[in-house]
């Protein structure tokens, strides 16, 4: 099954009135998203060997919250939604959607917000980005979207991605339409922007027990059934790993068919789990999975592969 977004004027009357039994798509809920992430990162930093980096990531997440409200986006996506629906493509496809100057405006605002909090190498990195030309910034953005991580240093990538993510999340939040689950391919990618997940979460509340993958760019979540590989959709050779016990709130789901893994966070075990923060704070589990010979099928927005990785 894949997910397609249907324009408002193409919805049937029943689709306008009622929601699907299982919502295939959860658009980003931007209110307090970044503050909640920052708080969770700071909480997880306590007694964590990666504490300093988690606090660094929390500073970026908090800056995203500030910039989100200081620089709102106004955009009519109606035409774009119709075109993408007709083509069966993600409406905010990172590989084809033209970027306007708004994302670079967001980057400069993030840098201004972060400067007083940064020192040493981190300050030098954002000052370097501040001096970069418009074209240089566009080239780095294009390289990240093409997974050409050797062209963007791993210390610059989180700042570039933070601005791009804000921009794409703002656009996703403006999408007029409704998602419909249909037969198709490439369920492992975000149906809104085509980017990769950061992790998956088994939720509580109105979506109790359902698993949703969380986009590492536009913050959208999309439904993928449990006990099925999110990367290749096979189900015969899955294994579940944790550092604690069977009741752990964070597990890695590995697949011997494709050789990859993705983390699953369980809200019923820990209601405060957050897709980005808890993934970043559990890198010890990633190290274990690498030792077992599995490759990660996701990317955390605060941790990009360096050259040669």
Swiss-Prot record:
InterPro entries: FdhE-like_sf, FdhE_C, FdhE_central, FdhE_N, Formate_DH_accessory. It is found in: Cytoplasm. GO terms for molecular function: ferric iron binding. Its main location: cytoplasm. It holds the Pfam family FdhE_N. One of its GO terms (cellular component) is cytosol. Gene3D superfamilies: FdhE-like domain (3.90.1670.10). One of its GO terms (biological process) is protein maturation. SUPFAM superfamilies: FdhE-like. Keywords: Cytoplasm. Disulfide bonds: none annotated. PANTHER family: PROTEIN FDHE. Necessary for formate dehydrogenase activity. HAMAP family: FdeH. Belongs to the FdhE family. This is Protein FdhE. It comes from Escherichia coli O1:K1 / APEC. The lineage of its organism: Bacteria, Pseudomonadati, Pseudomonadota, Gammaproteobacteria, Enterobacterales.
């Amino acid at each position: 099954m894949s997910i397609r977004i249907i324009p408002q004027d193409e919805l049937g009357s029943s689709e306008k009135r009622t929601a699907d039994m299982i919502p295939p798509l959860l658009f980003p809920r931007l209110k307090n998203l970044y503050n909640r992430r920052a708080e969770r990162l700071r909480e997880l930093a306590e007694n964590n060997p990666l504490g300093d980096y988690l606090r660094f990531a929390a500073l970026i997440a908090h800056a995203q919250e500030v910039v989100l409200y200081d620089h709102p986006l106004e955009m009519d996506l109606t035409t774009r939604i119709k075109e993408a629906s007709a083509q069966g493509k993600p409406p905010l496809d990172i590989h084809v959607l033209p970027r306007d100057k708004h994302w670079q405006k967001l980057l400069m605002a993030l840098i201004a917000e972060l400067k007083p909090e940064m020192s040493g190498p981190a300050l030098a990195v954002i000052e370097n980005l501040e001096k970069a030309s418009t074209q240089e910034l566009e080239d780095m953005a294009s390289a990240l979207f093409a997974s050409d991580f050797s062209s963007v240093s791993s210390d610059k990538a989180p700042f570039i991605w933070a601005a791009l993510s804000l921009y794409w999340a703002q656009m996703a939040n403006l999408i007029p339409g409704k998602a419909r689950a249909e037969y198709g391919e490439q369920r492992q990618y975000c149906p809104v922007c085509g980017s990769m997940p950061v992790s998956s979460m088994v939720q509580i509340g109105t979506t109790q027990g359902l698993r949703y993958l969380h986009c590492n760019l536009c913050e959208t979540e999309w439904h993928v059934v449990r006990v099925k590989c999110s990367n290749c959709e096979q189900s015969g050779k899955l294994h579940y790993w944790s550092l604690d016990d069977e009741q752990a709130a964070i597990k890695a789901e590995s697949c011997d068919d494709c050789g990859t893994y993705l983390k699953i966070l369980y809200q019923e075990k820990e209601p405060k789990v957050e897709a980005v923060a808890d993934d970043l704070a559990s890198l010890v589990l990633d190290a274990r999975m690498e030792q077992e010979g599995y490759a990660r099928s996701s990317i955390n927005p605060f941790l990009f592969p360096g050259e040669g990785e």
